[in-house]
């Protein structure tokens, strides 16, 4: 199931001031995150440039998990960000993008949620994963790349993934124009990023984020290597940490860089 998908068509579908205004497209690359960082380092690529590939041979997710998709079925892209804020704030970019993807998917008519910190889900199955990486310049962020993989037109998944992953096609019963989906994500990301940099935290986006948080008020298991525990997800704080209430009423602030969170009874 293929659609027209190239630099020109993605550009035509992207109506923004800066996010994805410049599009780079390749049939194949190692990973769009690596490509974006190389382009910044070697070619002077700048803020908001978007790198899109039909296939990536070395795509990765959180905790270095491999990620790949059949050609002509997914969106694999990375946006380059050159921020002024401190490196400690960079992990929040994952949540900004997660909200943006969820809003785009909602706009095309699907009931969508965010599985904190970096997955977007439909029918409690993963439809999108996000990986943010940064390159330092002295003690500042030189650039950050936010990598996004969206399952768009896949008609099936391998048996071992079928209970955890889905696609826009499987959930809606019809294919989607991937360029239009990219354009919607960029529109929402530009709006959300501009709100984020005003405060350099998620205070302005928190109400919208929590409305879409699939884990909200759900039992979760925090997979901390030293001290795994169960509790109830109560939302996020302004720093993007998940607030988990233990059985005794104490509330933990869970940092996404250190642990995974799973639903007690399912992936979410």
Annotate each PLM feature.
Residues 1-4, 18, 92-112, 122-268:
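Long, positively charged amphipathic alpha-helical accessory segments at protein N-termini or as interdomain linkers
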Residues 1-103, 128, 176, 251, ...:
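N-terminal lobe of the biotin/lipoate ligase/transferase fold
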Residues 27, 114-116:
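Short loop/edge segments at beta-strand edges and connector loops
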């Amino acid at each position: 199931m293929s659609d027209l998908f190239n630099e020109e068509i993605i550009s035509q579908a992207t109506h923004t001031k800066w996010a994805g205004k410049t599009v780079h497209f390749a049939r194949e690359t190692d990973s769009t995150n690596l490509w974006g960082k190389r382009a910044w380092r070697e070619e002077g690529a700048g803020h908001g440039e978007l790198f899109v590939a039909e296939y990536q041979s070395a795509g990765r997710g959180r905790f270095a998990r491999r990620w790949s998709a059949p050609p002509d079925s997914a969106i694999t892209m990375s946006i380059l960000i050159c921020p002024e804020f401190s490196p400690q704030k960079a992990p929040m970019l994952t949540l900004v993008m997660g909200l943006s993807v969820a809003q785009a998917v909602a706009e095309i008519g699907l009931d969508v949620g965010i599985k904190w910190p970096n997955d977007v889900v439909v029918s409690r199955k993963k439809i999108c994963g996000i990986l943010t990486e940064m390159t330092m310049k002295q003690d500042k962020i030189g650039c950050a790349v936010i990598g996004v993989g969206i399952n768009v037109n896949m008609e099936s998944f391998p048996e071992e993934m079928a209970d955890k992953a889905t696609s826009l096609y499987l959930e809606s019963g019809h294919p989607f124009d991937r360029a239009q989906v990219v354009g919607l994500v960029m529109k929402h990301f530009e709006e959300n990023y501009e709100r984020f940099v005003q405060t350099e935290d998620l205070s302005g986006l928190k109400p919208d984020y929590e409305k879409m948080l699939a884990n909200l008020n759900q039992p979760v298991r925090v997979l901390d290597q030293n001290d795994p525990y169960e509790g109830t997800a109560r939302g996020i704080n302004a720093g993007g940490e998940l607030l988990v209430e233990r059985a005794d009423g104490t509330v933990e602030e869970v940092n996404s860089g250190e642990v995974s969170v799973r639903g007690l009874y399912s992936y979410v």
